Amino acid sequence: MPNFSHKSQARQYSFERKIARNSAEFAKISEPYSSVVEETRTDKLVDTSSVHHVFLQKTGPCVEYKRHVEIPVDTSADATEETQWSLDIPWFGWIFRPLISRHIKHRHHKNRHPWWAPPQTFTAHETLVLALLAAASMVAAFINTLFTQTVAFAADEFGVSTTGQGVAAAIVRLGIVLAIPLAILGDRIGRQRVVIALAFIAPVLASLGALAPNFAALVGTQTIARPVGLALDVAVLVILIEEMPKHGRAYGLSVLALASGFGAGFAVAALPIADLGPTAWRFVYVLALIWLAVALSLRRRLTETPRFVAHRSEPKGSRRDTSRKTGITAPRTLLMVGAVAFLVNIFVATASIFQNRYLKDVRDYSATMVALFTLSTSTPAALGLIIGGKIADINGRRRVAALCIPLGAVLISLSF
């Protein structure tokens, strides 16, 4: 059973509507809905004046859900449908609560999922976990974007050349080796504990960049902070795979990517602060401490994955116990995915680290203009992430990757 004991903050909603007897919907009003919220009928009551149908949620994102249909015996009277539901979606409720509520108010029995919904219905627990993981992804994305966005401005203060910036970027990215043992800890002590710990540590380490007395110190702080952010990202992905339903994982990944865009976008949006003076870029690093609010939320509400709890009880030496400890279940697939990620990052890392320098020096953009450019070109991708994740769940991950990776590489190249 899902655990909602961690201070549920569900919001209550209700909606009532009249359904005319001569409408197409009236003929199916006593049937369960199956889009977004899958219903099950619990009661059919008959009194002298009306027939009553009561429906509860079988599977769906609502913490509580009840739909009551009253059909008067008087054939000239309209039917009444009253729906009550509650949603607990931390951090991203402002996006999904209106979408879900609007769907409930205007739905019909054609059983079509709206474009924004996952192809497989999520439970309330899965919805809560996805929202918390998305918040953690914002933290990781901000930390991982911070140095990339500010290095050009820090280099100006410290008098570092373009070559020096490239070397610094390589050093910071080589710190990824520090992320490996941190990520492995999730298999040893639990995913939840690792995610919560890293969500606290990463912002604090990143904020130390504001105190850097020289460029080397800045690089040193971010060489440690960035791997912690990457390890947080990995731990979040592990929980996502273990918690999300089979046909909803790509959708979940797309939501995490969308959240990562928000986190990175926050770093970009803060960039105009650098226009305030030669050392003003340091204040962008101070903003990392804001993300401790997410860490507190994770500590209060994120629970351990059932799969890890089950694996922890596996007999020592069993095949599943060995695969959990070594992390090796499909070496060929792991090698292929790793190779693709390596090649993609060779291209993306180089393009991202020098984009701001290109805009600043070649195009003569201010920090504000750099931020506006990045936000205006990246924001439309949010819609594509949701749609792409849904397509991947329906048509397969390989097809989407085979099309999007080369297409994205070509388009990024053309931007320069």
What are these language model-derived features?
Residues G248-P272, W291:
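Glycine-rich segments within core transmembrane alpha-helices of 12-TM secondary carriers
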Residues A169-I184, L237, L375-G388:
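Central cavity-lining transmembrane alpha-helices of secondary-active solute carriers
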